[in-house]
Amino acid sequence: MIDRKHYHLVGSIGKDILNNGKLPALLLIAVLASSSLVVITTYQTRRLTVEREQLLLEQNILDIEWRNLILEDNVISDQSRFEFVATEQ
């Protein structure tokens, strides 16, 4: 008679990996972890680069506004000085 045993493929593969392929399995896990970390690091680097560029643009806008405020303050103080001198004379 023919022996009809049911073999579970996933179980057989798992047993084979545990018994004979510990080093390749460990290397596979290490490669997958390493590649995942490369992807995460690349994403974070790109995100931080974009954020840095946005902050530099904001800094430039604020610097221009600061210079304009200094000019405005100088003009107002000059006008006040002229008014003071005019009222004194």
Swiss-Prot record:
It is a single-pass type II membrane protein. Signal peptide: none annotated. It holds the Pfam family FtsL. Its main location: membrane. The chain crosses the membrane at residues 23-40. Residues 41-89 are periplasmic. It is found in: Cell inner membrane. It comes from the Bacteria. Essential cell division protein. May link together the upstream cell division proteins, which are predominantly cytoplasmic, with the downstream cell division proteins, which are predominantly periplasmic. Part of a complex composed of FtsB, FtsL and FtsQ. This is Cell division protein FtsL. The lineage of its organism: Bacteria, Pseudomonadati, Pseudomonadota, Gammaproteobacteria, Enterobacterales.
